[in-house]
Regions:
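Compositional signal for N-terminal targeting/processing segments
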Residues: 23-419
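N-terminal export signals
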Residues: 6-24
Length: 419
C-alpha cells in the first residue's frame, strides 16, 4: 500500500528523471560513416560537393576515393587534359615489348624482393598487382607487404600480421583496402598462403612539422626500409617478398625527391629488388588525353594485355622512371564488358554474374559481400545508373550476399548467389 510519503518520493523521483538531460551526442561525419559503418556514399558525395565548390585539397582525395567505387570517369578522368595537337611522341621504332606477366615471372625467378608500384587513383593497378601476386607464389614468394597496411598506432588497432584466410577484412587494416579490388587481392593472397607485413612509417618515426619536403621524404623512406627489415628480414632473412607501394617509392636509383624506398632498401640490405613501374603508364579515359609516352606505346604496339616495353635494353617510361626501374608495364585501352571495366573482366579468376536489382531512389551502390565474412569490405561493387534493373558483378568463386547502399544507408541484403 502506498503512503503519502511514498507517493511524494515517487513524484520527486519521476520529476528528477524527467528533467535529467540526455547524454551529449553528435552526428557522425561522412568520414566516420565510412570508417565505422562501411558506408561509401556519404564520403563520396561530400568530396564531390567540395571539389565542385573549388576546394583545392578535395580533388586529390576525391580521385582516390572514386577509385574505391569504380568511378573511373572521376578517379582517372577528373584531371585529364588533351595533349597539344602538335605534341611530339617519343620515337618507338627501336622499342621492344613482351607480355608483362611472363616478363615479370622470368625476371623474378632469382630475385628475393619484387617491388611493384601503383597510382592511388587507379584501381586497375591493383587488379594487375593481384595477377602478379598470384604468379609469384609458385616461385616461392611467401610475404605480401604493402604501403597501405597500418603500422602499430598510439591507439589499439587491428594488425594485418594476424590476418588469416576467412577472417573479416575491413579498412582498419589499411585505407586503400577499402577498394574492393585491393581487398580481394589481400583475401586471395591469404588463400594462397602468403603472410603479410606492414612497413609504413609509424607516428613516432615522423620528423618535426617544420621539416622540408625532401626531409619528410627521406625520413619516410628510411623508416619504411627499417620497418620492412624489422618485420620480415630480421626473423626470416630468406623470405621472398612482394611489395606493392605508391608511385615514386619503386625508384631504384636517385631522382627527383632524392633516394626512395627501393634505392634505400638495396643500399641497406644488399638485396637487389626487381622494380616495376606502372603508375604513369595507364591510358587516359580518352585517347587524346594520353600522356605522350603512353600514346606512343599504344600506337606502336596496340596491346590487348599488359606489356613491358624497353628501348635499347632500358625500361621505357616517363622521365621520372626511365633508367630508375627494371621493368615498365603499360596497360591496354580495353572496352567495357557488361558495363564493367575491361581490365576487371580480364582477370581469369573473375566471372561476370548478372543479377537483378531491386528498385531504389537516388545514387546507389550494388555490392556483393563474402557470405562468411559478414558486413565488411565488398568483394565487388559499382555505382548504379538511375533506374538500373540489372547489373554484372565480377566475382571469384564463392558464396556472396547482395545488397544496396543508398543515401539512406545500408539497405537489408536482398539475395544470395554462389559463383
Amino acid at each position: 500500500m502506498l503512503t503519502r510519503r511514498g507517493l511524494g518520493l515517487a513524484a520527486v523521483a519521476t520529476g528528477a528523471l524527467g528533467v535529467r538531460p540526455a547524454w551529449s551526442q553528435t552526428p557522425l561525419s561522412a568520414e566516420q560513416q565510412f570508417m565505422v559503418e562501411g558506408r561509401y556514399l556519404p564520403q563520396y558525395l561530400e568530396l564531390k560537393a567540395q571539389a565542385a565548390a573549388g576546394r583545392p585539397a578535395a580533388g586529390g582525395f576525391l580521385a582516390q576515393f572514386a577509385a574505391f567505387l569504380g568511378d573511373e570517369a572521376t578517379a582517372i578522368g577528373g584531371d585529364e587534359r588533351d595533349r597539344p595537337a602538335d605534341a611530339e611522341l617519343p620515337d618507338m621504332s627501336d622499342a621492344e615489348s613482351r607480355d608483362a606477366l611472363s616478363a615479370i615471372v622470368e625476371a623474378a625467378t632469382d630475385r628475393q624482393i619484387v617491388i611493384l608500384n601503383e597510382a592511388h587513383n587507379i584501381s586497375g593497378h591493383r587488379g594487375f598487382a593481384t595477377r602478379v601476386m598470384r604468379a609469384l607464389r609458385p616461385l616461392g614468394f611467401d610475404t605480401f607487404a604493402t604501403e597501405t597496411f597500418l603500422q602499430p598506432q598510439q591507439e589499439a588497432a587491428p594488425s594485418i600480421r594476424r590476418y588469416r584466410r576467412g577472417d573479416p577484412l575491413h579498412s582498419g587494416f589499411g585505407y586503400y583496402i577499402a577498394d574492393p579490388v585491393y581487398a580481394e587481392a589481400v583475401r586471395e593472397a591469404a588463400e594462397l598462403g602468403y603472410t603479410f607485413a606492414d612497413y609504413e612509417w609509424r607516428w613516432d618515426q615522423r620528423p618535426p612539422a617544420t621539416a622540408s619536403g625532401d626531409e619528410q621524404i627521406a625520413a619516410r623512406e628510411a623508416a619504411q626500409v627499417d620497418n620492412l627489415g624489422e618485420a620480415v628480414l630480421k626473423g626470416r632473412p630468406d623470405a621472398r617478398i612482394f611489395v606493392l607501394c605508391g608511385s615514386s617509392h619503386a625508384r631504384e636509383r636517385e631522382g627527383r625527391g632524392g633516394l626512395w624506398f627501393a634505392a634505400r632498401l638495396k643500399a641497406l640490405t644488399g638485396i637487389d629488388p626487381l622494380t616495376i613501374e606502372q603508375s604513369w603508364n595507364w591510358p587516359a579515359t580518352r585517347p587524346q588525353a594520353d600522356a605522350p609516352h603512353v600514346a606512343a606505346v599504344l600506337k606502336r604496339f596496340q596491346p590487348t594485355a599488359p606489356i613491358v616495353v624497353s628501348r635499347n635494353g632500358i625500361a621505357f617510361a616517363n622521365s621520372d622512371f626511365e633508367g630508375r626501374v627494371d621493368l615498365s608495364v603499360f596497360h591496354p585501352r580495353l572496352d567495357r564488358v557488361a558495363g564493367r571495366p575491361g581490365w576487371l573482366a580480364a582477370d581469369p579468376l573473375r566471372k561476370a554474374v548478372e543479377v537483378s536489382i531491386p528498385a531504389f531512389e537516388g545514387p546507389a551502390l550494388l555490392q556483393a559481400l563474402h557470405m562468411q565474412e559478414g558486413m565488411v569490405i565488398p568483394a565487388d561493387h559499382f555505382l548504379l545508373e538511375a533506374g538500373q534493373a540489372r547489373g554484372a558483378m565480377m566475382l571469384r568463386p564463392g558464396a556472396y550476399v547482395l545488397r544496396l547502399e543508398t543515401k539512406r544507408g545500408i539497405e537489408p541484403a536482398f539475395g544470395e548467389i554462389v559463383v
